[in-house]
From Swiss-Prot:
It comes from Pectobacterium carotovorum subsp. carotovorum. The keyword Protease does not apply. NCBIfam families: PRK11112.1. GO terms for molecular function: RNA binding; tRNA pseudouridine(65) synthase activity. The active site is at D168. One of its GO terms (biological process) is enzyme-directed rRNA pseudouridine synthesis. It catalyses: uridine(65) in tRNA = pseudouridine(65) in tRNA. Keywords: Isomerase, tRNA processing. CDD domains: PseudoU_synth_TruC (cd02563). This is tRNA pseudouridine synthase C.
Length: 376
């Protein structure tokens, strides 16, 4: 067995042992934790967190890059007692420099062996329940990303897929993909002409007691790298979001200067499709979405993770209504909440309010279709 294969096998052994231990985490640390300059991120992470979210992904990415391995590095083989048939004392970890590779936290390496939940599939299109933390597809900024929805779906169904729309990386829920370029164009036209109705659910800070419409124009959010040649002086674009308050909860935990924390479960229906529209609109009315690191409340984000074991963005694309691009029949596609979402719903006393989204979790390697759609 080559040295590379030995290293890879040892990495899988470490990952399997970690999964079987009580230290395995489904929710990654806060994004700020990955900015540590200390060895092993000792000032921001626990050792088991660093092992799962930094060491293992970087090692896998380094192996996948097919670069020559330095002979002086034994990597995870230092955790084994045998090397080339000889007894060895366990040695210390050798930290992999971030300069040797590209790594964007959080990297869900475990997802590479997980099949996505298929909501709907026929000979023309497929819809999946996109997990939080997954990219829809690679771009030149993250071309080395190993876990992307399009590649996973392609491998899962054995057929090329085409993008129709996108969900932000931290957002979960219904993602529609076409199985031909013609169908992709037809579906894209439906999106552009606002013929599809999208419904999101979100958990926001504070009590929202009424329903309403947010009609607030948004300037374009530019990426410092990807949009560096884009005109920054574009006029604000119209943006409209309809919202409905579904439930409220007051939890006995002190966050900031308040002795309790208040939250609301919201239904959001965007009439337009501006970048980060729902996040920016909810922040505009002073009820930011929990887990939003760009427009949200950092104290509540941390409080949600520390008190309720949920560190993800609490925004889920729950439902998509459209006309089938070939048959013309109405389709309603629904995506269920993941385990962190379900945990918050249960702890906040909201269970049963939206039972259609409270489905049981699939086994990680089942690949079973959910058939969670309504054909009208």
């Amino acid at each position: 067995m080559s040295r590379e294969n030995q290293v890879r096998q040892s990495l899988f052994d470490i990952e399997r042992a970690l999964r079987e231990s009580p230290f395995w985490q489904v929710v990654p640390p806060e994004e700020e934790a990955f900015n540590s300059t200390e060895p092993f991120s000792l000032d921001t992470m626990k050792p088991e967190e660093w092992l799962q979210w930094v060491f293992l992904p970087r090692m896998h990415a380094l192996l996948d890059s097919e670069l020559a391995l330095p002979r002086s590095w034994f990597y995870c083989l230092i955790l084994k007692k045998r090397w080339k048939g000889r007894q060895k004392r366990p040695r210390r970890f050798c930290c992999v420099s971030s300069s040797s590779m590209s790594y964007s936290p959080p990297m869900y390496r475990m997802a590479q062996c997980t099949m996505l939940e298929i909501i709907y599939q026929d000979e023309h299109l497929v819809a999946v329940n996109k997990p939080s933390g997954w990219l829809v597809h690679r771009s030149w900024l993250d071309r080395k990303e190993k876990v992307v929805v399009m590649q996973t779906v392609r491998d899962q169904i054995g057929q090329h897929v085409y993008t129709v729309h996108r969900l932000d990386r931290p957002t979960s829920g219904v993602l529609l993909l076409a199985l031909s370029s013609e169908v992709a164009r037809a579906l894209s036209q439906q999106f552009e002409s606002h013929q599809m109705q999208k419904t999101y659910h979100a958990v926001v800070r504070g009590y929202v007691l009424d329903d309403g419409v947010i009609d607030y124009a948004l300037t374009e959010e530019l990426d410092k790298i990807a949009d560096k040649f884009t005109n920054p002086d574009k006029a604000p674009q119209p943006a409209v979001t309809h919202y409905r308050s579904l439930a409220q909860a007051e939890m006995p935990v002190a966050i900031g200067r308040y002795p309790t924390a208040r939250y609301s479960l919201m239904e959001l229906k965007p009439q337009t499709g501006r970048k980060h529209q729902l996040r920016r609109h909810m922040s505009h009315i002073h009820h930011p979405i929990i887990g939003d690191t760009a427009h949200g409340d950092l104290r509540h984000n941390r409080g949600m993770e520390s008190h309720f074991s949920c560190g993800r963005l609490m925004l889920h694309a729950s439902e998509l209504q459209l006309n089938h691009p070939v048959s013309g029949q109405p389709l309603t596609l629904q995506a269920r909440w993941d385990a962190p979402w379900q945990g918050v719903v249960t702890q906040f006393g909201w269970k049963g309010i939206l039972p259609e989204f409270e489905g049981v979790e699939f086994p990680a390697d089942s690949g079973q279709d959910s058939e969670h759609f309504v054909e009208q």
